[in-house]
Amino acid sequence: MSNSNSAKVRVAVLYGGRSAEHSVSCVSAGAIIAHLDPEKYEVIPVGITTDGAWVVGESDPERLRLVDRTMPEVQRREEIRPSLDPAHRGEFHFADGSLYATADVIFPVLHGRFGEDGTIQGMFALSDIPVVGPGVLSSAAGMDKEFTKKLMAAEGLPIGREVILRDRAELTDAEKKLLGLPVFVKPARGGSSIGISKVSRWEDLPAAVDLARQHDEKVIVESEIVGPEVECGVLQYPDGRIVASLPAMLRGTEDGEGGFYDFDTKYLDNVVTAEIPAPLDEEIIELVQSLAVETFQALACEGLARVDFFVTANGPVLNEINTMPGFTPISMYPQMFAASGVGYEELLDVLVQQALHRSSN
C-alpha cells in the first residue's frame, strides 16, 4: 500500500497474534479500524497469524467481525517485516525488501501473551516509534497476575487471597485451608477467561490445574470473592490528566457453563448485560474510580487500562488490570467511556495523540 496522504497520521493497527486471544484481537481491531477518524488518520493494517507470521492486514473491518458465533482469524497473505532500525522507524517491508508502508505510531491491538505482555512494546521501543498504551514494564507486570497482585499489595491496595503454583507444585493442606472453597484456577499470564476453572471440590483441583497449565506453566489459585463484578476504565490524556470512567456492573456472569464469566459467556452466548453507571452508592463509585487510577499509577501505566473489581460487603477488592482491554463492539472499555461522555472515535483520538505526545517529550 502507499502512504498517499502524508498530512494524516499513519496508524499501524496490529492484531491477531500467537495467544489464545487471537480472535478477540481481530474483532477489536476491526472496530478500531472502523472508528479511527479517516479525516485525521490513515490506517495501516498489520495481521499476525496464529503461528507468528506478520502479513498484510485486512483493511475491511467487516471481515474482522464475529458472525454467527464464528470468530475471525488472520489469514496467510503476503508477509511483511517491521523495521527495528531507528533510521527506518515505522517501516514495514515485503520479503523482497520493497516498502509496504511507513507508520507514525503503532496501535498494538494484541490481547494476551506475545502482545499485551511487553514483548511487542519492547520490540518497537528498539526502533523508537510511538506505541499506544502502556510500555514494557507496565504491560509485563499487568499481564502476570502474580506480579500484578504483588505490586498492588505493596501499594496497600485491596486484593484477595491467592497461591502461586510453579514447577508442577500442588496445593498443600495449609494452603487449601487458607483459600477455602470454592477457588478459581487460572493461568498466571492469560486473559479472556481462557483456561480458567471454578473448583468447588478439592478432588476436581488437579484437572483444573492441568487445564490452566495448557496455557501457562505458572498457575494462580484464588479464593472466591463474593460480590458483583465491576469494571472501570482509565484514560490518560496527552496533557497527562488521568481520568476514570463511570464503572460498569456486570449481570449474568454466573450463567456461563462453568458458573463464572468464561470465554463463551463474554463473547458468544449473549447472556451478560452491563449497567453503566453501576448501581452503587456514590461513595463506592468514587472509591472504585480512585482505586482504578491508583492501580494504573502503581503499575506506571500510560494511555489506557481497564481495572476489574469485586464489590464486597466490606468494599471493593481488586481482581486484575488489563493494559490493552478489548475494543470489540460489546467490550466494556469503550462502552464505559461512551457513558462517561467520550465516544469511540474521540477515545481512539486521545489514545493515539497521547502516544505521539509521550514520544515527543
Swiss-Prot record:
InterPro entries: ATP-grasp (IPR011761), ATP_grasp_subdomain_1 (IPR013815), D-Ala_lig_Van_CS (IPR000291), D_ala_D_ala (IPR005905), Dala_Dala_lig_C (IPR011095), Dala_Dala_lig_N (IPR011127), PreATP-grasp_dom_sf (IPR016185). Pfam families: Dala_Dala_lig_C (PF07478), Dala_Dala_lig_N (PF01820). It is an enzyme of class 6 (ligase). It comes from the Bacteria. Mg(2+) 1 binds at D308, E320. The keyword Cell wall biogenesis/degradation applies. It catalyses: 2 D-alanine + ATP = D-alanyl-D-alanine + ADP + phosphate + H(+). Its EC number is 6.3.2.4. GO terms for cellular component: cytosol. Pathway: Cell wall biogenesis; peptidoglycan biosynthesis. Its main location: cytoplasm. It is found in: Cytoplasm. Keywords: ATP-binding, Cell shape, Cell wall biogenesis/degradation, Cytoplasm, Ligase, Magnesium, Manganese, Metal-binding, Nucleotide-binding, Peptidoglycan synthesis. HAMAP family: Dala_Dala_lig. Belongs to the D-alanine--D-alanine ligase family. Cell wall formation. This is D-alanine--D-alanine ligase. It comes from Corynebacterium efficiens (strain DSM 44549 / YS-314 / AJ 12310 / JCM 11189 / NBRC 100395).
